[in-house]
Amino acid sequence: MYKRQLLHRAFAPHDPALRVSAFGVHFPGPLGLAAGFDKDAACAEGIAALGFGHVEVGTITAHGQPGNPRPRLFRLVRERAVINRMGFNNEGAHAAARRLRKPRSVPVVVGVNIGKTKVVPESEATADYVASARLLAPLADYLVVNVSSPNTPGLRNLQAVSLLRPLLTAVKQVADATPRRTPLLVKIAPDLADEDVDAVAELALELGLDGIIATNTTIRHGGETGGLSGRPLKERSLEVLRRLRAKTGDRLTLVSAGGVEDVDDVWERILAGATLVQGYTGWIYGGPLWAARIHRQLLRRVHRHGLKSVTEAVGRTA
C-alpha cells in the first residue's frame, strides 16, 4: 500500500490545469487506461499510481468464463499494433464486485465495462447485461456497455439500434437507480458505417446517455483472427470522433480510444472534441510510465497555448 502511495505521489497527475469534469465525475487528468488490461478489477490502484487519470476495468460478464483458446494475443511490433481474440476472459461480476467494494489506498476513478456472457443467446442479452449492471453499477464511477468487441460471437449485432435501444434502456434504468445515479456510456466499433455511427449518436441523445467511447478494435485487417488495436486504428478512430462531435456537439461526453500513442495524439483528440482519451496498446509499447509522461507533456502544451485548463481545449478544432 505504501509503495502505491509513493508511486501515486510521484507519477499521478496532480496539477489543477489537467483536471477534467465529465458527467459529474472529477478526473485528475484526461488520459485513462482503456478496458482490457484489468479484466477483473484487481489492480486499478496500482495502474492509477503510474499516471493514469482513470482506469476502466473489464470487460466483465455476468458469469465467469475462460475466454478463447490460446494463443489469443499477438504483437505486431513493426506496426506498433496488437491483435487480440481474448473473448472476455474474466471471473465474473460477483468476483469483480467483491474487489470493487474494498477500500482504496490511493484515489482512482474506476469505470466498469460490461459485456455479454458468451453462452448467453442474443435473445437473453439484455437480462445478462442487467445482471452485471445490478452488481457493478453501484460500485462504478461510470458504467460502460460494450457491444463492440469482435471476439464474442454475435456481440456486434447488438450495435443495431433496434437491438441496442432496449438493451441500453434496461441498463440505464439500473444505473439511474443507484444512490448517486451512475453515469452510463456505450462503446462502439470503428467498423460501423458512418450512418450507423450517426444512429448510435442519436440513440444516445434520445435515451439520455452520458457519453460514447469511440472506438474499440477493428476486424478490418489481414492478420490473425481478432481485433486490431494500435497505430493502424488511429485514422478511423479520429474520423469517428469528429463525426460524433459534429452530430452531438457538447451534449454528450466523448471518450476517444484507438491509436493513441503520444501527447500529439491526445492533444489532437481533445481539440477534436474528446473530453477524455484512453489508451492501452500505446502503453504496451510506451512502457510503464507512458501515461505519466504524456500528462507532463500535456501540461506543458496547455501552458504553451496560454490556457488555464485542458478543458478549454476540448472541441477547439471541431
Specify the residue positions occupied by each region the protein language model found.
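Glycine-rich phosphate-binding active-site loops on the catalytic face of alpha/beta enzymes
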Residues: 51-65, 147-149, 211-221, 266-293
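C-terminal helical cap(s) of enzyme catalytic domains, especially alpha/beta-barrels
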Residues: 64-80, 221-230, 284-308
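Short beta-strand/loop segments at the ligand-binding rim of alpha/beta enzyme cores
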Residues: 24-32, 106-112, 176-192, 244-256
